[in-house]
Amino acid sequence: MEARFLKSASDLESCPQDSVKEVCFMGRSNVGKSSLINAFFQKKLAKTSATPGRTQLLNFFEYNRKRFVDLPGYGFAKLSKVQKEAITNLLTQFLNFRQNLTGVVLVIDSGVVTVQDQEVVKTILQTGLNFLVIANKFDKLNQSERFHTQNKLAHFLKVNPNKCLFVSAKTGYNLQVMHKQIFELFKADGQAI
């Protein structure tokens, strides 16, 4: 089944009101989340931009009879304080109160993992949702950086290394593995850490 855009929502009340299970994609602004989503769908549905902070709504997509949600990016410095707070509140509410949600795909930049990413992992762990950390832009790292990053990422984020996958939306590296692991999030309840 081909992927398609369903709707955008600015708050939980505007989200689809049904019982279809969902997996959401979240990540810092400018980590290549939209490009990764498009690679996952094999179709350009999520809007990509060189300007960080473009996604400020919850964007719902349907693919293979499953629902996926592109969440606004967090941590973009050029947003106003009010905008940052609104996005933080929306993300927190969605993770904690969206009953359809069965899993979270946290997209990070392979080369720049932040304390903010670490805090988001803590928040995800507190929800009890199953999750997967996708380290995108792996193609931008040299061989030495790849080795060190793979060893440090799970330790820094305090998660099981099996929860971390290195990919490149640009080159297609590990996208088939990612595809399979994301669909597994619909089956699992809770996470092993």
Curated annotation (Swiss-Prot):
Pfam families: MMR_HSR1. Residues 19-188 form the EngB-type G domain. GO terms for cellular component: cytosol. The gene is engB. The keyword Heme does not apply. GO terms for molecular function: GTP binding; metal ion binding. Keywords: Cell cycle, Cell division, GTP-binding, Magnesium, Metal-binding, Nucleotide-binding, Septation. GO terms for biological process: division septum assembly. InterPro entries: G_ENGB_dom, GTP-bd, GTP-bd_ribosome_bio_YsxC, P-loop_NTPase, Small_GTP-bd. Necessary for normal cell division and for the maintenance of normal septation. SUPFAM superfamilies: P-loop containing nucleoside triphosphate hydrolases (SSF52540). Belongs to the TRAFAC class TrmE-Era-EngA-EngB-Septin-like GTPase superfamily. EngB GTPase family. GTP binds at residues 27-34, 53-57, 70-73, 136-139, 167-169. The lineage of its organism: Bacteria, Bacillati, Mycoplasmatota, Mycoplasmoidales, Mycoplasmoidaceae. This is Probable GTP-binding protein EngB. Its cofactor is Mg(2+). The keyword Metal-binding applies. Mg(2+) binds at S34, T55.
